[in-house]
Regions:
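Extended non-catalytic accessory segments flanking core domains
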Residues: 1-183
Length: 183
């Protein structure tokens, strides 16, 4: 997002260099969830630094009802590194909390998704190698390889996803584990 928080709001590694600071960012709403929404820098304003993300999550239930996908918004709030669950192995998610949101314009085109390739996903890469895509629209030729954290009701036949799933790019050799002993 453009502003005094970008590219610094997300930074170029696993945590934000402005964690705990109040920032002002501007971006296009790309997705709306129950407790917040994602914004991303318009394509023509992206910083072109391949190590930094152009997107960020805005956490705040009260602001969800006032935005729509495609809105250009200005957000003032505190940058926070949120770690889902209590397990230390999960990476933190950079988000803006306690937001004040102002809609600048509506019906803007969404930023183009970044096409992920096998060069973006190095099995021997750093744990935070995907940080540069955090909060951004991405696409790829993916194959799901693991279950979601959603819900399944066998009695009614309903299943729902929480949006979290495990996937690999099509053509990835042995996508579930690293090469080892032949079985």
């Amino acid at each position: 997002p453009v502003g005094n928080g970008s590219p610094g709001a997300n930074g170029d590694n696993g945590s934000s260099p402005v964690d705990g600071q109040v920032v002002r960012v501007t971006g296009i709403v790309t997705a709306i969830l129950k407790k917040g929404f994602y914004i991303q820098t318009p394509d023509d304003q992206a910083d072109k630094d391949p190590k930094t993300s152009e997107g960020i999550y805005v956490f705040g239930e009260n602001s969800v009802g006032m935005v729509s996908a495609g809105d250009l918004v200005q957000v003032d709030g505190t940058v926070t590194e949120f770690r889902p669950r209590t397990e230390r192995i999960f990476l933190s998610i950079t988000e803006i909390t306690k937001p004040t949101v102002k809609v600048i314009s509506k019906s803007n085109p969404l930023p183009a998704p970044i096409a992920l390739t096998s060069t973006d996903l190095d099995p021997k890469g750093k744990l935070d190698q995907m940080e540069r895509f955090e909060g951004m629209r991405v696409t790829g030729d993916f194959v799901a390889v693991g279950p979601t954290g959603g819900v399944t009701n066998e009695k009614t036949g309903f299943s729902g996803s929480n949006g979290v799933f495990f996937a690999v790019l099509q053509g990835t050799p042995r996508p579930v584990r690293e090469p080892g002993l032949g079985i």
